[in-house]
Amino acid sequence: MKRFGELLNYLYTNREGKFIFYDRDNNRFEYDSVDIKKHILIVSDHLKSKGFELKKDQWIRLISKDNCSSFFMMFALLSLGYNVLLANPNDDSDRDSFRTVDSDVYYEASLDKEYDLGDLEKREFGSWVGFYSSGTTGYQKKFVYNVETVLRLISNVRSIIMDNNIYGILEENKMPSDRRILSTLPMYHILGFLVPFIMYSLECDIVFCKYLYPNSIIDSINKDNILGVFGVPLVWELIMNMAQKRFPDSANPIREMLGDKIQIVLGGGSKTNRRVRETYIDSGIDFFVGYGMTEIGFLSLSSSDLEDIDSEGSIYPMYDYKILNEQGKLMDCGEGELVVNTRGIYSYIFDGGEPKSLDLIEGKYFETGDIFILEDGKLYFKGRKKNIIVSSNGENIFAYEIEARLDRSYFNNIPFCIGDYQGLVALYLYNYGGLFSEASVEAIIRHLVDVNKGLHINSKIKKSILINEKGVLTSKGGLAIYKLNENSDIRVVNVK
């Protein structure tokens, strides 16, 4: 089996680009390929001094505090033979199941030590890197990749980008310092792990945001001369709204906010609102979207064309795919669950301490858990199976369709939306970064009650208000059903 030393050699041998990090104290560092290998070696030596001996394929759970420390700790542990499970610092679910180390240990190492890169070349690296994901099920599982799959994913996506308008923009900016790509996601996210390696392989400088919030992203775009940036759709919507409020009289508020250099935005991780894509494209910034999953990596990439604003693009030509309808039949087009045969480019599910193969239909098709309309080779997202709300008459209602109809309001600077969908009253709270507590949710509900005391719940509304499951917000915000009755103390706002 190949090991992660091959990824290190593939990426950091004879390449001109740099990795630019902001550490936990917001210090900025630029590292070329030699610097990167040097730091990995020094950090691994520091780990050995703390009792992390050379181990072959023992699992370590790495608490990912920031991208700078996570990057070097991950490769340092791999260089000692460990397999690494990257974990969100807010998640304690497996702390007792694995030997666990915080990425902050990186800051204990003396980075000006003497080093011999030849020692790094001799090491037998670990074989696996793992991620947590709720995947298709709605509850958290662990998925792990071997280096062969990671290298093939990088190669496949790289070839797709080279046939996309993204590459044309890169070619207009010849030097790596002119084609800087900003990563706005943590490395424990599959996008935050893979996209920097893919873009670095295209001779780009990679800049890692320290704080993964809109103001920090805006600052980095302007300060680091960013050509392209990728992240989740909610970020682009928040930045769009901030620009329109900050520059209400500008003909192009997004350009006022982000400057003239940026030309590429890549959204992924969930559905991007049509209006958001249109606004960026109208501002002169190409907006691409891609579809993928923790379990199988990236599957599609769109154009930046107003005529193709609703699709998630076409699935990569090296993959085979079908639509699984409600009757369990595999179809070449139509509406249903997308199933994909990526010809062996899968993660493995990590269960009982061992990587195990995913369950596949007919031994080859992976069920994505996502509902699409597949038409003329393009994907049109409808929703996730796990998020479908079934109405009283048996109709499937997708949360995305509800969200698209909501109007934004603010209470104590907390953004929320209220609207209607087929007789349901909906309250949607934006909770990027997990900022809002349950008390904040209750405060908004009390606010809605106070300002709408005179309203009575209409019988046509079915006495339902959509908030979040059990009143606890996820890191992205969310929707769930709270059933009310005519005598409830909670009253709903008037809807259109």
Spans of model-derived segments:
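Conserved AMP-binding/adenylation subdomain of ANL enzymes
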Residues: S155-R180, M187-N252
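Conserved AMP-binding/adenylate-forming
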Residues: F29, H46-N90, S183-T184
